[in-house]
A protein has these predicted regions:
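N-terminal regions immediately upstream of nucleotidyltransferase
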Residues: 1-72, 83-115, 328
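Terminal (often C-terminal) interaction modules
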Residues: 1-18, 35, 268-328
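Short, solvent-exposed beta-strand-terminating loops
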Residues: 77-94, 167-174, 178
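Intrinsic-disorder-associated interaction segments
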Residues: 4, 22-25, 29, 118, ...
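Short, flexible loop/turn elements at secondary-structure junctions
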Residues: 61-64, 79-83, 155-157, 166-168
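Catalytic cores of NTP-dependent nucleotidyl/adenyl transfer enzymes across multiple folds
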Residues: 6, 32-38, 110-266, 324-328
Length: 328
């Protein structure tokens, strides 16, 4: 068997055994999530303020999309609340969403309103949701997520947390698009639509999904803490549009590193076409990421040169300088 083929097999094995989530954990996590959504719906529907729009609840994020890598630490859920005659408007040009309260909010749940206004405050709503979640069996604790867009729920029986985002679902706007309205971290609301992210991931083949996982692993092990997982995925979606899909994992991985070090200085487009440029990194952060990616790209080239000379073991050792534990 050629050194090329051996390297490809080892990379796939590395992904399956070192990077991918444990299959038993995944099965257990799916069941725990579905059961939790059922429990949350039952509890919230007892509170007239929260009338759950079950058909629009949404599982999203890297766990749902199949791009999560070890360890499984969080699962994302959106719990949709029925509008019940609440309305909203968009404050241009900052795209801040204001939700106008309904009769019940104003007269019976005014603790969720901005002070002396009729606007629904997303931070206050998160706190109300946090208090309601304490009624769940197996509850351990709940806190407002650091981005103030979700409630992080910890249950006693599982090692992973659940990040729960309360949301509303809009009617079609003038352009025909529908949106989820989620907390923006400042007490207001913002538009989102994670369904688009899922559609984009569903179009990828197995090799492309493996590249996402490898790059996430590289990002994590190389301590590039300024690179958020979602930003990486968006960059790689753009990269996949520029490269042939019929090449090996190691060539695609090498070229992905090249794409990162060349394009981290550029705009990173929001695939949902809502937020505009996602690249909020400062100059120093971009330079640091670019230098690390370029260094690893050069090492990958050296490894591939060794493969071309049929030096498989030396090539594996060289790749392990980029992917920790690869030669383990």
């Amino acid at each position: 068997m050629s050194a090329y083929k051996l390297l490809e097999i080892k990379l796939k094995s590395f992904i399956e055994n070192t990077i991918d989530l444990n299959k038993n954990d995944v099965e257990k996590a799916y069941k725990s999530r579905d059961n939790l959504i059922k429990n949350i719906t039952e509890i919230l529907n007892e509170n007239l303020f929260f009338n759950v729009y079950e058909e629009r609840n949404l599982n999203y994020g890297s766990f749902e999309n199949g791009t999560k890598i070890l360890e499984l630490d969080d699962i994302d859920i959106m719990i949709c609340i029925k509008a019940n005659y609440r309305t909203y408007y968009d404050l241009f040009p900052n795209n801040i969403i204001k939700i106008i309260a309904n009769y019940y909010d104003i007269y019976f749940k005014n603790e969720c309103l901005d002070n002396e206004t009729i606007f629904l405050n997303s931070t206050k709503l998160l706190n109300l949701l946090k208090n309601e979640l304490a009624k769940i069996d197996d509850y351990e604790k709940a806190d407002i997520h650091k981005n103030k867009e979700a409630v992080t729920l910890k249950l006693k029986s599982y090692k992973w947390n659940f990040d729960i985002v309360p949301c509303f679902f809009t009617m079609p706007e003038y352009d025909g698009r529908e949106y989820y309205l989620i907390p923006d971290g400042e007490g207001n609301w913002k538009k989102s639509d994670p369904r688009i992210d899922r559609e984009n991931i569903d179009k990828l083949n197995e090799t492309q999904l493996n590249i996402i996982k490898l790059i996430k692993y590289w990002n994590k092990k190389k301590k590039i803490t300024t690179m958020k997982s979602y930003i990486l995925e968006c960059m790689l979606l753009e990269y996949f549009n520029e490269i042939k899909n019929d090449i090996s994992i190691y060539y695609m991985f090498k070229k992905a590193l090249k794409y990162i070090y060349e394009n981290i200085f550029c705009h990173i487009c929001d695939p949902k076409n809502i937020q505009g440029d996602l690249n909020k990194l400062n100059k120093e952060e971009r330079i640091s990421i670019s230098e690390k990616a370029k260094k690893c790209y050069i090492i990958c080239n050296e490894a591939i040169n060794l493969i071309e000379r049929n030096n498989y073991n030396e090539a594996v050792n060289k790749f392990s300088e980029v992917l920790n534990d690869f030669n383990g």
